[in-house]
């Protein structure tokens, strides 16, 4: 379900792209140090975004360096290391573990079960470090699964379940900023859930699997359906952006530029080609 929260490359210059690479490679390196290759295979843009957000907000001591790795052995790449990349690595493993379990339950994918089993030994320590977040992840996934198994097309309830999950992950600690971070995560989580449904609609229809947007697709003409989906996605990102603007993050810092770029442009990077492809097929 993750992979939609990325940057819009054309809207950034080299210093910002290098800083993004530092956080992304830093997260990969942190996953490798803490969880080995199985951890690195769970790397996602979405959790790199959360690490950048927390770093911009809380301004921790961050070590920037450069180095080579197995996938990139020739040219040294920038790297970052701080406490929020450690946190993002833990949340990456927790979310990936439950996602693999969900895939196993839905599709009986042995590959997903195998991946979940590789990550399972790390879960007790992650739960001990982050009890509030991991409890919210399990509770909201249970709520979401119950809605989906019941065939619910209550988009508000479905988005709320995944939004509350991501909101808990956004709130690193309980402080003055946690309500704003939770609300921001709630909006972004709703967007991710709907974007995943929009992306997977043809595949889910072929397999006869639940899709939150199927009812809308079946009842609206194609053009109206596309416009309605765009409105729903815009609404969720509007909630996210509204809360983001309340945070004391300087727009002109490298991290600030990355966050503004992602929220206002990057998250739409996958939507646009999907819609263009579908509208082309309808002609």
Locate each region found by the language model.
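Acidic catalytic motifs of isoprenoid enzymes
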Residues: 1-183, 190, 194-234, 238, ...
């Amino acid at each position: 379900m993750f992979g939609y929260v990325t940057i819009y490359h054309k809207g950034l210059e080299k210093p910002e792209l290098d800083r993004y690479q530092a956080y992304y490679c830093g997260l990969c390196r942190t996953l490798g140090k803490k969880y080995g290759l199985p951890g690195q295979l769970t790397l996602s843009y979405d959790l790199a975004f959360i690490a950048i957000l927390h770093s911009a907000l809380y301004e921790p001591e961050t070590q920037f360096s450069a180095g080579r790795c197995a996938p990139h052995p020739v040219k040294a790449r920038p790297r970052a290391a701080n406490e929020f990349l450690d946190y993002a690595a833990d949340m990456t493993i927790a979310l990936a573990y439950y996602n693999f379990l969900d895939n196993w339950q839905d599709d009986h994918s042995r590959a997903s079960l195998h991946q979940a089993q590789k990550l399972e030994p790390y879960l007790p320590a992650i739960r001990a470090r982050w009890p509030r977040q991991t409890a919210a992840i399990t509770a909201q996934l249970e709520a979401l699964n119950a809605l989906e198994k019941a065939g619910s097309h209550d988009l508000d309830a479905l988005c709320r379940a995944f939004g509350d999950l991501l909101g808990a992950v956004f709130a690193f600690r309980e402080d003055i900023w946690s309500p704003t971070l939770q609300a921001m995560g709630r909006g972004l989580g709703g967007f991710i859930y709907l974007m995943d449904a929009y992306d997977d609609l043809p595949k889910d229809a072929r397999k006869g699997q639940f899709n939150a947007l199927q009812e809308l697709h079946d009842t609206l003409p194609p053009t109206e359906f596309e416009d309605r989906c765009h409105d729903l996605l815009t609404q969720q990102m509007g909630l996210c952006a509204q809360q983001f603007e309340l945070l004391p993050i300087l727009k002109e810092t490298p991290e600030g530029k990355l966050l503004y770029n992602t929220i206002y442009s990057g998250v739409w990077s996958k939507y646009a080609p999907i819609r263009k492809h579908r509208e082309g097929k309808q002609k």
